Swiss-Prot record:
The active site is at residue 66. SUPFAM superfamilies: NAD kinase/diacylglycerol kinase-like. NAD(+) binds at residues 66-67, 134-135, 145, 163, 165, 176-181. It is found in: Cytoplasm. One of its GO terms (biological process) is NAD metabolic process. Involved in the regulation of the intracellular balance of NAD and NADP, and is a key enzyme in the biosynthesis of NADP. Catalyzes specifically the phosphorylation on 2'-hydroxyl of the adenosine moiety of NAD to yield NADP. GO terms for molecular function: ATP binding; metal ion binding; NAD binding; NAD+ kinase activity. Its main location: cytoplasm. Keywords: ATP-binding, Cytoplasm, Kinase, NAD, NADP, Nucleotide-binding, Transferase. It catalyses: NAD(+) + ATP = ADP + NADP(+) + H(+). Belongs to the NAD kinase family. This is NAD kinase.
Amino acid sequence: MKLAIIVNITRDKALELACELVAWLDERSIDYVFDRQSAKAIGSGKWEEKADLNQHCDAFVSLGGDGTLLLASHYSRSKPVLGINVGDLGFLTEFSPDEMWTAMEHLVSGNYSKHTRSQLEATLESEEPMTALNDVIIEKGTATRRLPAFVIRLDDEILGSYRADGIVIATSTGSTAYSLSAGGPIIAPKSNVFVITPICPHMLTVRPIVISDDKTIKVSVDSQSGEFPLKMDGIQKKLLAPGEVVTVKKSPHHVNLVANQKRSYCEILRKKLLWSHEHPTGQ
């Protein structure tokens, strides 16, 4: 087995864990490689470009928060991703640093369970598809005279057109990310749905809508001028022109996250969102 290791190099704890992991792997003669930035940060000569990691590795280890895991997922292409949480919240990174070694034992032995998560695929005319595990976001950008109108179609039928600061199209996995901050619902991660969530809409009647994930969503921005950022999992990919159409649908490719069998989704919600903070469970 060969592991690809991606590290949040801005966090000292992640760098410390990376060095400990290297020693652990070396002791067991397990092959590994870092991406270029991670290798440079810890002084390792074993690295490859991120785009090449999937071709040469059997599994990915993410040391950081959800953002680091999202980065790893873009390159994993359905190969298992083990997320160790050294971030702040961590909905996706299921293992704590204390749980890392047991999780690593299970990973290298093949004795692990996984969560298979759907992704979004966004395309522009005559361009290659882009994928996102959490969400596709289109923002108002440089349209300054008045809020732009976002025109949304489902399977080529108009759903609506409304003025807002932007729009989030999220998977069930991504429902606890930007969509939640914008007022969207929490959706159980294995639900076969997407949620379309407006960002600060001009009208109070504009609300998030949950749709089946077999729908094709088309979004364009009705504005006389401006450029509108298109982001995939928070990373800007394009600046859209007025009227340019983004087609969003379920990707044929999945992400496989190594599961923590000691934690249920209900427990994750309780702990991350402090749902039992005011009234502890059982009291």
